[in-house]
């Protein structure tokens, strides 16, 4: 069954930097994101996930758009992307899902930044009045690596939960 998630491109006050978190599981850089929980609005999910993954409390600024990723395991995923700005908190309070939280210039993102994330940031910078609606496809080899990584992460989490 397809899932629904929310992601947030968090900009600095001067709009010259974007907040990224380095994921604990795959060690890649991405924006704060996660699945929508029962009864949550998109905005509530965005605020919760950003605080959990980065330690920062944010205010939602703008809806960027909807990205359908049909190849993701479980029947695909729709990601609703927003922009936000920090209104409190500190990076030192990030949760276990992140091993690092840092600000980067959009033109100087780290090499291990997820390809889709680069697109979300670019679309956020354009500032279009109309929300974007895109389908994002991945190469077959990337899908296979992702599936293997998710299986290994699941096994690791089960082992960790039993220790």
Descriptions of predicted regions:
Residues 1-18, 35:
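Conserved N-terminal beta-strand and adjoining loop/helix that marks the start
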Residues 34, 48, 61, 104-107:
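Structural detector for helix-capping/boundary residues
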Residues 16-52, 56:
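Conserved Nudix-box catalytic region and its N-terminal flanking loop in Nudix hydrolases
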């Amino acid at each position: 069954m397809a899932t629904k998630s929310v992601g947030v491109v968090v900009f600095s006050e001067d709009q010259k930097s974007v907040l990224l978190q380095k994921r604990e599981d795959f060690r890649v850089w991405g924006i704060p994101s996660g699945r929508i929980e029962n009864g949550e609005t998109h905005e509530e999910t965005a605020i919760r996930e950003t605080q959990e993954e980065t330690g920062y409390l944010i205010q939602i600024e703008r809806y960027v758009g909807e990205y359908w990723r049909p190849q993701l395991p479980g029947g695909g995923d729709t990601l609703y992307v927003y922009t936000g700005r920090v209104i409190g908190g500190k990076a030192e309070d990030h949760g276990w899902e992140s091993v690092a939280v840092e600000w980067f210039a959009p033109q100087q993102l780290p090499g291990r930044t997820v390809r889709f994330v680069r697109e979300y940031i670019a679309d956020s910078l354009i500032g279009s009045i109309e929300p974007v609606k895109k389908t994002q496809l991945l190469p077959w080899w990337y899908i296979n690596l992702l599936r293997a990584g998710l299986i290994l992460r699941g096994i690791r989490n089960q082992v960790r939960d039993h220790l």
